[in-house]
């Protein structure tokens, strides 16, 4: 999801501003109800909004309106086949971040506004489930804006390819079968985190990162060179996979290898992750939760040097990052991006960073489910 990235206004009724019992205190008492009944009704009415609550509520409603407006504008442009602005997804991304940040500011001053769970598994303090249709449209628009180019070379087995490549690379790097399987799972999780599980996509928020692993040109070339260095070992270990690799290389020819699913994934893994595969046993010991393992390897995509420094520190979870540039990269990828309290953070430990990656929760759950399907098919 490394993207510099990747309906009607939902009105929050201001129950606190309703007239108390429609002015019931001014009515006669035709039913002969006891005066204590009127007293209990009056006491049951919530107190008026404070200035900070009113400000937060108004700010949130404005951001919902702004988000709805940019979604509507981009949909109209797409439907009319108009030329889209450069990086057409950036305005949508910023509007979504603003809406979720404003909601977090609202729930910080009005905890009672925290509502029900939502299908995207976003913490309810950051997102009103009534706005799910807006996120549905957001995802649909990104799917259109990031559609693979006409010359992209798709795979009939995109998920299996990722697992197979991650697994064989891990074996070449010296892992046993069990730990190599973990590498395959992690590889699939990174693919989902980068592309939402869609192969050969473009990037509506960047002119640099493309394909199934969202790599830049230089990253892709580095990965290609590293793969060439282990090619003979791959051929000896897994002749069938090596034959597939030869076929895909021939298929790519002189075109952009990032837009061939196989080579895009292969080069992306070799560039950023393969050198860390031998350390998977140690990473699993430091991070026993499989979701944390997947989060950490996604951080290798986003902030590779600091993530590796944290691993090398010997105290992974307590390693603190405070460089403003790195904190900016994290915020650009939906960590510490929502609300005044989150954005005020000037540093964070690796534990805090991993915990802040809750926007990836649904993505990793789907990746795990798909990994289970791939393994079941292999055993079947």
Region locations from a protein language model:
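Catalytic glycan-binding domains that act on GlcNAc-containing polysaccharides
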Residues: 145, 149-339
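Bacterial N-terminal signal peptides
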Residues: 13-37
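Low-complexity, Gly/Ser/Thr/Pro-rich intrinsically disordered linker/tail segments
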Residues: 340-380
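N-terminal secretory signal peptides that target proteins for export/translocation
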Residues: 1-15
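N-terminal pre-domain segments of enzymes
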Residues: 45-138
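Boundary at the C-terminal end of the N-terminal hydrophobic targeting segment
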Residues: 42-46, 152
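Acidic/histidine-rich, surface-exposed loop or edge segments in extracytoplasmic proteins
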Residues: 71, 137-151
């Amino acid at each position: 999801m490394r993207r510099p990235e990747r309906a009607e206004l939902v009105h929050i009724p201001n129950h606190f501003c309703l007239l108390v019992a429609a002015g019931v205190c001014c009515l006669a008492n035709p039913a002969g109800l006891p005066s204590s009944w009127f007293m209990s009704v009056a006491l049951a009415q919530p107190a008026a909004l404070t200035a900070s609550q009113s400000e937060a509520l108004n700010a949130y409603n404005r951001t919902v309106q702004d988000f709805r407006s940019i979604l509507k504008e981009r949909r109209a442009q797409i439907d009319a086949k108009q030329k889209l602005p450069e990086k057409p997804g950036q305005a949508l991304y910023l509007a979504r971040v603003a809406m979720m940040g404003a909601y977090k500011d609202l729930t910080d001053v009005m905890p009672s506004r925290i509502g029900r769970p939502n299908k995207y598994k976003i913490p309810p303090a950051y997102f009103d489930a009534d706005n799910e249709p807006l996120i549905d449209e957001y995802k649909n628009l990104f799917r259109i804006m990031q559609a693979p180019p006409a010359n992209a070379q798709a795979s009939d087995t995109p998920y299996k390819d990722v697992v197979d490549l991650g697994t064989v690379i891990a074996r070449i790097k010296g892992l046993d079968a069990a730990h190599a399987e973990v590498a395959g799972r992690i590889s699939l999780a990174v693919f989902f985190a980068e592309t939402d599980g869609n192969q050969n996509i473009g990037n509506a928020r960047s002119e640099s990162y493309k394909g199934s692993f969202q790599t830049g040109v230089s990253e892709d070339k580095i990965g290609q060179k590293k793969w060439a260095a282990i090619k003979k070992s791959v051929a000896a270990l897994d002749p069938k996979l090596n034959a597939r690799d030869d076929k895909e290389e021939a298929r790519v020819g002189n075109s952009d290898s990032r837009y061939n699913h196989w080579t895009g994934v292969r080069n992306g893994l070799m560039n950023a992750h393969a050198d860390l595969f031998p350390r998977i046993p140690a990473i699993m010991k430091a991070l026993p939760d499989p979701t944390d393992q997947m989060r950490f390897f996604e951080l290798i995509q986003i902030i590779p040097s600091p993530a590796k420094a944290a691993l090398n520190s010997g105290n992974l979870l307590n390693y603190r990052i405070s460089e403003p540039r790195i904190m900016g990269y994290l915020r650009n990828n939906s960590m510490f991006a929502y609300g005044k309290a989150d954005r005020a953070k000037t540093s964070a430990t690796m534990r805090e960073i991993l915990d802040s990656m809750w926007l990836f929760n649904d993505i990793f759950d789907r990746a795990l489910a798909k990994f289970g399907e791939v393994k079941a098919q292999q055993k079947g």
